[in-house]
Curated annotation (Swiss-Prot):
Transmembrane region(s): none
Single GO molecular function: 3-phenylpropionate dioxygenase activity
Gene3D superfamilies in alphabetical order: 3.10.450.50
Organism for this UniProt entry: Photorhabdus laumondii subsp. laumondii (strain DSM 15139 / CIP 105565 / TT01)
GO biological process, any: 3-phenylpropionate catabolic process
InterPro entries for the chain: 3PPDioc_HcaF, HcaF, NTF2-like_dom_sf, Rng_hydr_dOase-bsu
Family stated for the protein in its record: Belongs to the bacterial ring-hydroxylating dioxygenase beta subunit family.
Catalytic activity: 3-phenylpropanoate + NADH + O2 + H(+) = 3-(cis-5,6-dihydroxycyclohexa-1,3-dien-1-yl)propanoate + NAD(+); (E)-cinnamate + NADH + O2 + H(+) = (2E)-3-(cis-5,6-dihydroxycyclohexa-1,3-dien-1-yl)prop-2-enoate + NAD(+)
Enzyme class: oxidoreductase
Name of this chain's protein: 3-phenylpropionate/cinnamic acid dioxygenase subunit beta
Superkingdom to which the source organism belongs: Bacteria
Length: 180
């Protein structure tokens, strides 16, 4: 999914923007409450869930449209996320003992139409605060490009694609065991 260009003609109505925004706020509340099984229900079977870091490029290279290679931190599907969650539920995932306390913040949502009916792109900025033990605190900052589609069974929404790009070029945290 390419980075979205804000196109006034492709923007959704305020009512639809509100509906999709509320769905995404509900989704991050599930993650903060460690309700991972409920969260999985919001993901489509054909989900693509990726995270990469930003790569610093020299100005002269950007002018020539030379893109440095991307560093992928994960490239998961729904089955792989189910496995990650099953591991977290065992109590044996050392990186999450004791479990992290998280707060997901989502802002600047731009929602636009796609070529498919009932499917929309959502570009947003996020901040994920993670606290664990007494002194371990981490901030993950970046942008998300989501694709959501209407679930014909429930008339709600499903996330069918999520691309997460961290703003950090160098990762200084111990692990990536939390969900974005």
């Amino acid at each position: 999914m390419k980075e979205l260009i804000v196109n006034q003609e492709k923007r959704v109505s305020p009512e639809l923007h509100y509906e999709i925004s509320q769905f995404l706020y509900y989704e991050i509340a599930l993650l903060d409450e460690w309700r991972f099984r409920d969260w999985l229900e919001l993901l489509s079977e054909d989900l693509s869930y990726t995270m990469r870091t930003i790569v610093n490029a020299q100005t002269r290279d950007r002018r020539k449209s030379i893109q440095p290679p991307t560093t992928w931190l994960f490239n998961d599907n729904k089955f792989q996320l189910e496995r990650r969650i099953a591991r977290l539920e065992t109590g044996m995932a050392w990186a999450e003992e004791p479990p992290s306390r998280t707060r997901h913040l989502l802002t600047n949502l731009v929602i636009t139409e796609t070529d498919l009916p009932d499917q929309f792109h959502v570009q947003s900025n996020y901040l994920l605060y993670r606290s664990q033990k007494e002194r371990d605190e981490v901030f993950y900052v970046g942008k998300r490009l989501d694709c959501v589609r209407r679930n014909p069974k429930t008339d709600s929404w499903l996330i069918c694609k999520r691309e997460i790009t961290l703003d950090q070029a160098v990762l200084t945290f111990h692990n990536l065991s939390v969900l974005f």
